Amino acid sequence: MKNTTEEKREAIPNSVSRMLLAGIGVLLQVLWIFWLALKLNDYSTAIQVCTSVLTFLITLRIYGLHINSAYKISWIILILLFPIFGLTIYLLFGRSGAVSVMRRRFGENLTMLRRYHAPILQQRRALPYPDRITRNHARYLQDCAGYPAYDNTDVTFYGDTCEALEAQKTALHSAEKFIFMEYHAIEDASAWQEVEDILAERAAHGVEVRVFYDDVGSIGFINSKFVKKLAGRGIQCRRFNPVIPILNVFMNNRDHRKITVVDGRVGFTGGYNLAEEYFNRTHPYGQWKDSGIRLEGDAVRGLTLIFLELWGATQKAAPEVERYLPDVPYTARENAVVLPYADNPLDDEATGENVYLNMIRSAKDYVYITTPYLILSDEMQRTLRLAASSGVDVRIITPGIPDKKLIFSVTRSYYASLAKSGVRIYEYAPGFIHAKQCVADGTEAVVGTINFDFRSLYLHFENACWFCGCSAVADVRRDFDALFPVCREVTQEYADTRSLAVRGWDCVLRLFSPLM
């Protein structure tokens, strides 16, 4: 087996060539569509009429969709201003989850997996919720999203991803039956190699090991031999939605989930991927800040079923489920209520956004949020502003050093309206904050993969964990308390009236921000 350095040298050119091939292939096909449309326009006014009719019909179709209004308006404006370009881009990339084969497979698999959630949902036990508000928030996730709440579970919060990785490796070492790992990005470098060696050692002892990664998320980090390399070490590995040089409307929907499950008894999730910068082994954007949680107990069942959602949807045969849901004896130390949940772009339920909205609307004292990207719907903006205007201490932490400069400009374009309503905005001065966490009133918290942006809330496959009634909620709050002193508060800077040119540019950015 090649060492890590050699693997890394191969990964970069290999990935660049794959991206270039895919990009050139897609670009040529898009240009061909434009050329064909323009040539047809030259020969017949009937084509122009057809284009106008199609523009009108597609616009009506978009307007009638049960999706966020800002998302609809951005597409409608683009199509009306540039009909051929707008129609082409929308038909290729704007229809979330439009591929019928994947929609059917995912839907069938999800329906099958719901049967394993059903017994927990039907029990409706009197779980130890701190108050009526948290009970209602859990009820939404159970009744509308189909994910049950669990007790008899301990939650450990990690504000330091190095600690999270060490805990994860310890859990992997203890595996006796199976290991499931699903990540948006895996980098074949030192952090992953430490994990891979443990996986290979466990596989050699008869443990079933599955690794699932998103092809776009990992394309700059691993080479095309990665799957074969893992197979040679006894590890099952699959890519989600592989990049191909052919137009594919599903290519815009990525697997952004981060899950590890060991034997159905221990699970991990959070914002961090298995790449070097997440553990500050490299520093492309200054200090990297992320977070995660460890679950032990009954709620790991929910995390296991979430992993099987996409793993099962990428195969034709129905996945085996029962043997991955063992009845593991466990007695929790705390009376927590824990609810792992997921979101996907193939239905009309904006689960991730609704959980955040519920927490913000119900907050009485404070709600604190971290997100790497801040691209908000009108409803989310109104909810944040209303909470702040009603006396709730609303604070949002975003990066101080961006990984994407255009998206950072879009993020900042939302500051002014929020700051003027009393929302306090902080930028993480040491570098890039990638954590996706929210805590409200010291009673409930969410840690997971879901950013406050349109891609996370509407286009990607995501997961998170909501929990209450345990010390981990206070740990999340303490993490915020440690963050604020190292952040730069920019509230007043953006609350003050700025120049007309700056305000105009912000409007342009926000107009098309849902498409970014």
Question: Language-model features: where?
Answer:
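N-terminal localization/anchoring segments of enzymes in phospholipid and broader phosphate metabolism
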Residues: 1-354, 358, 362, 402, ...
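Glycine- and other small-residue-rich loops at beta-strand/loop junctions that grip anionic moieties
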Residues: 184, 372-373, 407
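A short, conserved beta-strand element enriched in hydrophobic/aromatic residues
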Residues: 290, 370-371
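Helical hairpin unit composed of two closely spaced alpha helices linked by a short loop
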Residues: 363, 373-395, 399, 404
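Short glycine/threonine-rich loop-to-helix capping motif typified by GTGT followed
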Residues: 382, 408-412
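Active-site donor-binding acidic/aromatic loop of nucleotide-activated sugar
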Residues: 425-429
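Catalytic-core elements of nucleic-acid end-processing and repair enzymes
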Residues: 436
